[in-house]
């Protein structure tokens, strides 16, 4: 009798279901090819050291953060990016941090609309035009100042 119960228990255990893995998130669709994204990245890195200028949108005249993004995307991908950080929040597709690739946008804020933006260049780094008196530079997303910000990511 015990052997029948044991055999039945073994049979039922063998019929158990395997845990189902959650589906992978759908890839984010982009207007920018991977090759264009690489050109965006290379061009952004090449602008490091360009002076900051409020309202600036050329390498000769300097850049503010949205001007840098607009110039790079127009030059390398033929896209017209919005010229304000608030408008960049609606440009392209949102994406989770684990899908971030070079050429994507990073937007920073403090709980309200974003107030600053840059171009992700890989390995946890981004290029941006930070402030008056400064220059276009590369920073790390995990640097103290940026890690405290609310961050979102967009793929044009």
At which residue positions do the language-model features occur?
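Bacterial N-terminal signal peptides that target proteins for export
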Residues: 1-4
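Extracytoplasmic/secreted envelope proteins and their assembly/folding machinery
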Residues: 38-41, 45, 49, 66-70, ...
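Bacterial Sec signal peptide processing site at the extreme N-terminus
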Residues: 9-34
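...with weaker cross-activation on analogous glycine-rich loops/strands in unrelated enzymes
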Residues: 28-29, 79-140
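Soluble non-cytosolic domains of exported or imported proteins
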Residues: 31-38, 59-64, 94, 144
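Glycine- and charge-enriched low-complexity intrinsically disordered segments
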Residues: 145-156
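Secreted/periplasmic proteins that engage bacterial cell-wall peptidoglycan
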Residues: 53-81
């Amino acid at each position: 009798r015990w052997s029948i119960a044991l055999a039945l228990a073994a049979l039922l255990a063998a019929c158990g279901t395997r845990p189902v893995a959650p589906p992978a998130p759908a890839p984010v669709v982009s207007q920018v090819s991977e090759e264009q994204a690489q050109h965006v990245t290379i061009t952004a890195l090449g602008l490091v050291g360009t002076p900051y200028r409020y309202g600036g949108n050329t390498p000769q005249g300097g850049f503010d953060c949205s001007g840098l993004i607009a110039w790079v995307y127009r030059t390398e991908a033929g896209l017209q990016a919005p010229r304000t950080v608030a408008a960049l929040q609606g440009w392209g597709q949102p994406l989770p941090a684990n899908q971030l690739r070079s050429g994507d946008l990073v937007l920073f804020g403090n709980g309200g609309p974003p107030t600053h933006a840059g171009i992700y260049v890989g390995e946890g780094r981004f290029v941006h035009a930070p402030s008056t008196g400064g220059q276009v530079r590369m920073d790390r997303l995990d640097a103290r100042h940026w890690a405290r910000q609310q961050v979102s990511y967009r793929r044009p």
